[in-house]
Amino acid sequence: MAPVLPLVLPLQPRIRLAQGLWLLSWLLALAGGVILLCSGHLLVQLRHLGTFLAPSCQFPVLPQAALAAGAVALGTGLVGVGASRASLNAALYPPWRGVLGPLLVAGTAGGGGLLVVGLGLALALPGSLDEALEEGLVTALAHYKDTEVPGHCQAKRLVDELQLRYHCCGRHGYKDWFGVQWVSSRYLDPGDRDVADRIQSNVEGLYLTDGVPFSCCNPHSPRPCLQNRLSDSYAHPLFDPRQPNQNLWAQGCHEVLLEHLQDLAGTLGSMLAVTFLLQALVLLGLRYLQTALEGLGGVIDAGGETQGYLFPSGLKDMLKTAWLQGGVACRPAPEEAPPGEAPPKEDLSEA
């Protein structure tokens, strides 16, 4: 049975392979650490921005999967550092001979699987952010006025912090505030004629104005911020509603958050792809180094050539061997007679 992808490794190539694996393993550990930082940062961002995502959004699964993949990649890199360093010293390598094989299997199945899952999520989930942000922001703006309603008391504070931090206003622009009641009914005077007319003129009984909250104001603007009666050209003679308003944030929060979260997901996906490549190289190199050293009894500087390989035989032969071994293991052992006891003899009847 011929081995799969054999590679002849003389003395110097074996040493260079071990040294190269030591460097690649450190790079893999570093990449795993960077993935941990990136996924942790994305988790923190989603903890603050989760209010503005739809409850059915699956995007938070991405940093969780990436966190697990980064931890496994970091562990695989550290194992590679230890194994490659020990392989250069015949006195340090024997403890690794029994555990390196199972570690390679675990790193290939667990680490590789997690990286593939994380990379797939990084490519698929950002596309669902558009609808999730749209639904979440509609709900957040609708509850802006509910400062005394249980479950929505923090909506105003969260929306104000969002608009001030990300320099945005409304969902797609400041005019989105014209279609929602953002002033709490507690601060409205039902006896005021203007208030009563606005409420009665709305089908849903909402108090709608052509104004925006204070958090939409741009503090860097040299002019006073215009918050009220923005659609009335007579109220502000120098303000043209058809021109961009320099006093208010120009972008909507939907566009800003979508770009921000997609950039974070893109960075995380790139790191997962690089880590997958590094982990594949490290695991392949460790496998060749392990099988080469097994042929030399674990001594890397032994004279002569040795052969490294991925599998000792083809897939068909491996399955056949495993089947035969399993059949032997499952076959019941023959019962043995106790020592000192002769098997009973059958009585022969006389003819």
Curated annotation (Swiss-Prot):
Role of this protein: Plays a role in rod outer segment (ROS) morphogenesis. May play a role with PRPH2 in the maintenance of the structure of ROS curved disks. Plays a role in the organization of the ROS and maintenance of ROS disk diameter. Involved in the maintenance of the retina outer nuclear layer.
Subcellular location: Photoreceptor inner segment membrane; Photoreceptor outer segment membrane
Keyword Transmembrane helix among UniProt keywords: yes
Subunit and partners: Homodimer; disulfide-linked. Forms a homotetramer. Forms a heterotetramer with PRPH2. Homotetramer and heterotetramer core complexes go on to form higher order complexes by formation of intermolecular disulfide bonds. Interacts with STX3. Interacts with SNAP25.
Gene name of the record: ROM1
One Gene Ontology biological process: protein localization to photoreceptor outer segment
Gene Ontology molecular function, alphabetical: protein homodimerization activity
Taxonomic lineage: Eukaryota, Metazoa, Chordata, Craniata, Vertebrata
Spans through the membrane: 20-44, 65-84, 103-125, 264-286
Record-linked InterPro entries: Peripherin/rom-1, Peripherin/rom-1_CS, Peripherin_LEL, Tetraspanin/Peripherin, Tetraspanin_EC2_sf
Protein name: Rod outer segment membrane protein 1
Gene3D superfamilies reported for this sequence: Tetraspanin
Keywords annotated in UniProt: Cell adhesion, Cell projection, Disease variant, Disulfide bond, Membrane, Retinitis pigmentosa, Sensory transduction, Transmembrane, Transmembrane helix, Vision
Cytoplasmic side: 1-19, 85-102, 287-351
GO cellular component: photoreceptor outer segment membrane; plasma membrane
